[in-house]
Curated annotation (Swiss-Prot):
Catalytic activity: a (3R)-hydroxyacyl-[ACP] = a (2E)-enoyl-[ACP] + H2O; (3R)-hydroxydecanoyl-[ACP] = (2E)-decenoyl-[ACP] + H2O; (2E)-decenoyl-[ACP] = (3Z)-decenoyl-[ACP]
The encoding gene: fabA
Keywords, comma-separated and alphabetical: Cytoplasm, Fatty acid biosynthesis, Fatty acid metabolism, Isomerase, Lipid biosynthesis, Lipid metabolism, Lyase
Pathway the protein acts in: Lipid metabolism; fatty acid biosynthesis
Domain of life: Bacteria
Protein name per UniProt: 3-hydroxydecanoyl-[acyl-carrier-protein] dehydratase
Family: Belongs to the thioester dehydratase family. FabA subfamily.
Record PANTHER family: 3-HYDROXYACYL-[ACYL-CARRIER-PROTEIN] DEHYDRATASE, 3-HYDROXYDECANOYL-[ACYL-CARRIER-PROTEIN] DEHYDRATASE
Localization per record: Cytoplasm
Keyword Cytoplasm: yes
Length: 176
């Protein structure tokens, strides 16, 4: 069984997030964030073990938007827009990060999402994306799994919402 002990830090810099991608933040047994260019945040402003809509934990993170971000040059030529799936992946990344933050061990894998709604887009002239994750449940048994609702906001406007984001931590992913 995993024993989850919360990390005492409540915010993380870009350098901290890169350390997570190298397996240095939560140790070699803990979950890792992806490295750039798949890392979809520049900082985590707030992590709480309680709080959020369900009082099970809350995460707020940001991504600074620049016209030279790699996806703008290919999605789509002449009509650049950040792929919506990257915003969804960012929310999964944050749920997995939360599981590592509370002391969970294993390799993080997205397990699903209940519903996703897109009501806007992220264009190269945007300034900042804010992600908000409201943890709903954490299971800490042989498998550590987190479930959350989340939203993506661009320049103060909510443009994506997701319910029942699920991420699990696995000791062995060979049979996954």
């Amino acid at each position: 069984m995993n024993t989850c002990t919360p990390n005492i830090k409540s915010s993380y810099t870009y350098e901290d997030l890169l350390a997570s991608g190298r397996g240095e933040l939560f140790g070699k047994e803990g979950p890792q964030l992806p490295a750039p260019t798949m890392l979809m945040m520049d900082r985590i402003n707030l992590m709480t073990e309680n709080g959020g809509l369900f009082d099970k934990g809350y995460i707020e993170a940001e991504l600074d938007i620049h016209p030279d971000l790699p996806f703008f040059s290919c999605h789509f030529i002449g009509d650049p827009v950040m792929p919506g799936c990257l915003g969804l992946d960012a929310m999964w990344q944050l749920v997995g990060f939360f599981l590592g933050w509370i002391g969970g061990k294993g390799k993080g894998r997205a397990l699903g999402v209940g519903e996703v709604k897109f009501t806007g887009q992220i264009l190269p002239n945007a300034k900042k994306v804010t992600y908000r994750i409201h943890m709903k449940r954490v299971i800490n048994r042989k498998l550590v799994m987190g479930m959350a609702d989340g939203e993506v906001e661009v320049d103060g406007r909510v443009i994506y919402t997701a319910t029942d984001l699920k991420v699990g931590l696995f000791q062995d992913t060979s049979a996954f």
